Amino acid sequence: YYRRFFNRVVDKPSLLFIFTVTCVYTQPCYQAENEVLKFHMQEAFQRIQMDTRPDGFATVIMDELNQDKVKQLKDACHRMMVEGDFVKYENVYHGVLTECSSQSAGIQLADYAVGIMNGYLRKHLMSRGDYTFATDLYTEFVLPHLRKHANGTVVGYGVREVPSDSSIRQVLMPLFN
């Protein structure tokens, strides 16, 4: 099923994955959860703004999750827009919209891609269990559509550690570059 699903969407030239990663096992975080959520939103919004053509417009649509988490994410996004950022979000809707994944192929795609990335990272960082299926799907469907620098670098472009941490980045670089 997953391969059939991905085969239908991977031919879209605009398909691009950006993952923000927090390594909760090795990265102590002294920030409140709402601040970490804001960092995740900020990383994604900055990259979306950078990649949007001057005459283009982007909207972030995410899974409904649970109502408390959605409220936290929307509040984080609102604070990011109100408090400002070094990037001016001229081509990105200043909020997030939610949709039920069972009613949206785009949200299903994001859900599957996140699950695949989770399996790929678990295999390489935790070495528990058999993640062959996830790593095969990662190589076949996610890797070709990861946001990259012109020189092919993925970490820092399509995969961002949140909060920024050079030691985590050093762990991620061999997995993606």
Name every feature range the model reports, one short phrase each.
Residues 1-177:
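Phosphate-ester processing/binding pockets and catalytic centers
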